[in-house]
Amino acid sequence: MATVQQTVESGIIPIVIELNDVVFFESSERLSRTFLTINSLDLGVLGYPQYRFVAHRTKQAYHLTERHLTKLMRIIPALVVDRPEISSYIVPVYARLLKSGELVDILLKALALYPEAYAGRVCIELSCDVLFEDLDEVREAMEQIRSMGFKTAISEVGDTFCPVFRVAELPLDYVFLDPAVITRLMADDAGERVVGSFISYLKDLGTLVFAPDAYDEATTAALRRAGCDGCVGSIVSGEDVVPADEIADETADETAQEIADETPVEETVEDSTETAPLDEITVGEADADTAEIGGDD
């Protein structure tokens, strides 16, 4: 299994940030969902879907969230100049980090490291798992995050098991719909009416509502009619994704040393069902000679 040092020596930067734009239908403003691309000699490139799974569901959640936020806040001053149309950079976060209080600690550390960063440009995106938690505790934690200047969002809203009416209990800036909502929207006229009413309900709460990828003009038109504010740019569309090497760390050596010097925090794991195969991406061990990106076959 290749070590971080071997990966860097091959000319590959192990971990970089990429941006996936969220396009508004009625304005030039944009949001940007950010994610880490993990490059491994053995595993290849672990992109957006895999990263979101790791960040939400495995024991790497704390480690990746901390690294993600720190790297993002370091480059935000430059991004604000280069891409003024983007009002928020969104970071996916596992709901249990909010409940445990670890997320607040991560944000405080990031602000202390980069006080020149614009907290108001960063949005914390929680999965809809948060709706199954104690809403009083969740609301208190989210209000604390917002008091620090950060925005908040929730994703995967509207799937079969999502308690959608609990969304009204949380302070949110953005809501990202589950793909199941789009399937219902495109099924028939009745589906379009139902989805339109659902989106209207969410917007009455004071949030902006965004859809997953819209791959064709018919879907985009239906989303507009339903009152959706915009949609996520396709992750496979080159024009919507900023290449990783444009906003990579200063040097590959620095990145490798950062990874080698840090040990993942794994206290968020409560049972073995959450450590799916992708949690084998242990990106921080004792030193650069032994740190691995990837696990045993």
Report the location of each language-model feature.
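EAL-family c-di-GMP phosphodiesterase catalytic domain
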Residues: M1-P14, E18-S28, F35-G44, A95-L97, ...
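A general structural motif
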Residues: P84-S88, A117-R121, S147-G149, L172, ...
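Catalytic core of bacterial c-di-GMP phosphodiesterases, primarily the EAL and HD-GYP domains
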Residues: L31, Y62-E137, D213
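Charged helix-capping and loop-helix junction motifs
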Residues: D105-K109, E137-E140, D189-G196
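Inter-domain helical "communication" segments and dimerization helices
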Residues: M1-V4, V8-P14, H56-H63, P84, ...
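Binding-interface segments
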Residues: Y51
